[in-house]
Amino acid sequence: SIDSIDECFILSTCNRVEIYVSSKVKSVDAELIKFISNFHKVKIDNSSITYQFMYGKDAAYHLIKVASGSDSMLLGEPQIVNQIKESYKIASTAQTIGKSLHKLVQVSLFAGKKVRSETSLGNRVDSIGSLVLKLSNKLFDNLRERSILILGTGEISQILISKPKIYIHSFSN
């Protein structure tokens, strides 16, 4: 743990890891990088990993954009809502969520829902997994007669595996 951090919420998806913290100290950047580096036993410097820090309203606005699907690889991608909820649940279980981050997550989910319901982002129902399946169907004749190898067991793999009558082999280390 980091003494200067009061609350922590980690959002991890297939293409992002975001760490939201609440602290009475103005900047915990160096402490956070040092903690992650020590925890994972890797050296983190500007050339080895891309990271950025946001503070206050910028960080809150960013999570709202993420929750609305407007900051996704696939614009409007709906899976992020469940990923935020699951990350929140994990942080709650670990007792790292307090009043500040609880409010931030709830406001972000509410705002994200409002954006989806009042804009065209809500009309986009495809996930990356379903788009992969659609593209595969276009590229290959009769996909149901083919075997598919999926490396990994992430959320996209789970979506592909759940499709009926398609023979899929999934491997992960």
Where are these regions (language model features)?
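Short hydrophobic/aromatic-rich motifs at helix boundaries and adjacent loops
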Residues: S4-I5, F35, K103-V107, T153-I156
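Alpha-helical elements of the RecA-like P-loop NTPase motor core of helicases
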Residues: A30, N82, Q158
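Hydrophobic alpha-helix position signal
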Residues: I36-S37, A91, P164
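Glycine-rich phosphate/diphosphate-binding loop of Rossmann-like nucleotide-binding domains
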Residues: L133, N137-N173
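A glycine-rich (often HGG/GG-containing) alpha/beta subdomain
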Residues: S1-S72
